């Protein structure tokens, strides 16, 4: 592991690495199984799901970034990066809503759909949202900026009932922009963490990050760790969950190449039961 300790030291993270390459191969291997909706009920549930996803992006991912800008003390580089994050994620959210409208024009998918959420148990993840509102460090490591999604999003983006337009939107817009703008934030995250280490000490800072990460990972932060959403997508869209097998390896890679130290072990309560969760291994300094 390269020594990347200290503010301003370039991180060792590489966008193309064996883990993301493995996930991309999994994505591609599922393409042949994808198909368009066969009838109006399938168009309706696909449209309502995509509408739900778009509204969730706008209300929560974008909303929390706006909250962070207005409530947390941060420098202007952070404000610039978060503004770009807001623009990108808002485009994705609105894009999913418009894709939903094209699939099922009988419904305005920009409007709340509480009946859909109630029917399938897609409740707001209030605990996870609350963590992100505490402070900037919690927002970074509990939320969308820390890119666990490079591995976990293969599930939510792996729906088997879809359309060519949705696939093109996800490939050309969502996946490309997600990787690009998240990766641009990683050097800033590294420097912010090492600023905290210089101010408060390494042990307390690492302990605080470990606490935030563990609490967030057990608050249904992502679809694959949220049983209601995961079960809904497995039942109606046959999404993959094999990608979770690479999660702990990806977590180790992120910590070592972005922060310069290993993660503390964590047990995720809502881990998919079909995939064995690796045994906990103590972090080495």
Give the role of each language-model region.
Residues 2-285:
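Non-heme di-metal
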């Amino acid at each position: 592991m390269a020594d990347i300790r200290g503010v301003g030291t370039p991180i060792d993270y590489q966008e193309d690495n064996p883990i993301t390459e493995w996930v991309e191969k999994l994505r591609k291997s599922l393409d042949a199984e994808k198909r368009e909706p066969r009838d109006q009920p399938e168009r309706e549930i696909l449209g309502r799901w995509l509408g739900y996803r778009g509204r969730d992006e706008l209300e929560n991912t974008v909303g929390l970034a706006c909250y962070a800008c207005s409530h947390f003390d941060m420098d202007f580089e952070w404000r610039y990066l978060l503004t770009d994050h807001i623009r990108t994620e808002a485009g994705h959210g609105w894009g999913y809503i418009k894709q939903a409208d094209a699939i099922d024009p009988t419904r305005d998918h920009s409007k709340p759909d509480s009946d859909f959420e109630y029917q399938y148990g897609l409740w707001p993840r209030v605990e996870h949202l609350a963590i992100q509102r505490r402070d900037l460090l919690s927002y970074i490591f509990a939320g969308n900026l820390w890119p666990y999604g490079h591995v976990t999003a293969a599930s939510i983006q792996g729906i088997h009932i879809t359309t060519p337009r949705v696939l093109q939107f996800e490939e050309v817009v969502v996946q490309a922009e997600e990787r690009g703008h998240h990766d641009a934030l990683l050097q800033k995250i590294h420097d912010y963490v090492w600023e905290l280490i210089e101010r408060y000490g390494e042990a307390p800072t690492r302990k605080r990050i470990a606490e935030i990460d563990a609490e967030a990972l057990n608050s249904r932060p992502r679809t694959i760790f949220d049983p209601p959403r995961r079960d809904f997508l497995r039942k109606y869209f046959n999404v993959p969950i094999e990608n979770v097998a690479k999660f702990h390896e990806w977590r180790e890679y992120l910590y070592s190449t972005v922060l310069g130290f290993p993660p503390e072990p964590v047990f995720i309560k809502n881990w998919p039961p079909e995939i064995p969760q690796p045994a906990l291994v103590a972090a080495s300094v």
